[in-house]
Each structure stands twice: as structure tokens, then as C-alpha cells.
Amino acid sequence: MSALIKVLVVDDHELVRTGITRMLADIPDIRVVGESASGEEALSLVRQVAPDVVLMDVRMPGMGGLEATRKLLRQNSALRIVAVTICDEDPFPARLLQAGAAGYLTKGACLEEMVRAIRQAADGQRYLSPEVAQRLALRAFDGDVAQSPFDQLSEREMQVTLMIVHGERIQDISDKLCLSPKTVNTYRYRIFEKLGVEGDVQLALLAVKHGLSGVNAG
């Protein structure tokens, strides 16, 4: 019999956590040992439940998946983290892999693919969903990774950027990211300065040019 793989599910949406837990309940060599609604909570919970693999949502209010991945791996370098995103056009795969993530899945992945990713991660291998692997390969081939001005943005700046591009108001962004409107505006002007744009319209046009306009912000 295969060794039991202990999994922690980290996602700010309860329905997603519950759905993943139920999907994995009938897999004999995998056991969900905990659920966390935030990156901050995951840092504490990992110490308590000692998972082998963490399924990590990429975008969450507060500490996002990228920052949580970095901190968890500093806390325990043997931990295996599989990032999960709602969209295969996400701008973060390369960053998360560089941060030490063992895999990258989309939330549209079937049960078989999720199980494969968990098992490969637990076995010390890496797993990328076919869509993400293809996109990374194409970007590397075309040289887009080095050329994209968005690569200089932090994870939080990227979150704010995507929300602005999708037409969300400052107050909406503030509420979703648990930040004050003043802080959101600070991020906004910092983004403008880094990207060399003068407003939301120019930012949106730049996002379209670099293929980010269809990326889901949350």
C-alpha cells in the first residue's frame, strides 16, 4: 500500500475548499488533514497538521499565494506546495515556480489531474497542468518573460493592476484585499510609475498588449 499523503487545502472560498476535500475523500492514499482560508492562517496550521502537500490558492485577500509559498518554504523547505489558480492565463506561474512551488494547477482540473499533481509533488517531482506548461514554454520561446513590464510588479501590485483593468473601483479593491482606500491608491500610483503609464486607460491598453486583459483578478 502506498504511503498516506497528508494534504492541506488553502483557499479563501469555503465552497472551493469543501469541494476539493470531498473530491479527495475517496482517494485511499490521500487525506485532507486541514483547511485554511488565508495564507496567514496556513502558516500557523502547517505547524499543527504537518501536511506533506499544500494546495495553495494563488490569489487571496491579505497574504497571497506567492508570499505564503515563500514563507512556508522558509519555515519548512521539505514542504511540497501545488499552486492552484482559476485561470490558465495567470501571470504568476513562473514566479511561483521560482519561489519553490512543486506544481501549478488550474481550478478546472479534473480529479485525476489533481491526484496526479499531489502524488508527483509528494514524490519529489514537479507537476504543471498542460495549459500552464504550454504557456510557459511559448513565453520562454518568444522571449516574452524578459520583455513583459508587468514582471517588475510585486504580487500585490499585480492583484491591484488586474482589478483596475477589470474596471473595479478603489473602494471595491479596498474591500476585497482588506486594504484602506489610501493604500490602494498608493499601490495604484506606484504601478503607474513602474509601468510608465499616466492613468487607468493607458494601464488597460498595456495589459491588453501583454495578454493580461483576460486574466481573472481574484
Language-model regions, residue ranges each:
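Conserved acidic segment of CheY-like receiver
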Residues: 3-16, 20-24, 153
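Active-site beta3 strand of CheY-like receiver
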Residues: 49-55
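Short amphipathic alpha-helix used as the core "switch/output" element in two-component signaling
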Residues: 44, 66-78
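Short, flexible helix-to-coil linker/hinge segments that flank and couple to helix-turn-helix
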Residues: 91-98, 103-159, 201-202, 209-214
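Recognition helix of helix-turn-helix DNA-binding domains
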Residues: 169-202
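Helix-turn-helix DNA-binding segment
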Residues: 146-182
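Acidic catalytic/metal-coordinating carboxylates
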Residues: 38-41, 61-67, 88
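Active-site residues of response regulator receiver
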Residues: 57, 85
